[in-house]
A protein has these predicted regions:
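N-terminal module of bacterial RNA polymerase sigma factors
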Residues: 1-27
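Short, charged helix-capping/linker segments at alpha-helix termini
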Residues: 11-19, 30-49
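Amphipathic alpha-helical segment used for protein-protein interaction
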Residues: 8, 12-15, 98-112
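Structural recognition of an alpha-helix C-terminal capping motif at a helix-to-coil junction
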Residues: 31, 45-52, 56, 65-77
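Arg/Lys-rich amphipathic alpha helix in sigma70-family domain 2
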Residues: 59-62, 73-92
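Amphipathic, non-transmembrane alpha-helical scaffold segments
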Residues: 18, 22-26, 72, 108-112
Length: 112
């Protein structure tokens, strides 16, 4: 069954067909998330989040191109939201701050 027909039927009440759509694109979306994150566990979570959003908004989807592109857009937004919400704060050093002599000794010990 073509994506357009699947989506039409899902939008008109046949929610069981969501499983077919998810199975069809799951690996592609997982690979995309893994490409963006480099983390298998996180990619799994982001893939799940992508499909949860699809389930929530499938009723508003209008067929205007490849469905896979639509899913990739959702996945990209999910990944970007994750990165925005989980920024790592980096401590900036003042121009006058330098590393301590002890830091250098610690580095030498680690290298040996």
């Amino acid at each position: 069954m073509e994506d357009k027909e699947l989506i039409y039927k899902i939008q008109h009440g046949n929610k069981e067909l969501l499983e077919i759509l998810i199975e069809k694109y799951y690996d592609d979306i997982y690979r995309f998330c893994y490409y963006k994150t480099g983390n298998s566990s996180l990619s799994y979570d982001l893939t799940q989040e992508t499909f949860l959003k699809l389930i929530k908004y499938i009723g508003t989807y209008k067929h205007r191109g490849k469905f896979k592109s639509y899913l990739i857009t959702i996945a990209m937004n999910v990944c970007n939201t994750y990165f925005d919400e989980n920024k790592v704060e980096l401590e900036e050093l003042d121009d006058n701050q330098t590393y301590k002599e002890n830091d250098s000794n610690e580095l030498s010990r680690i290298e040996q």
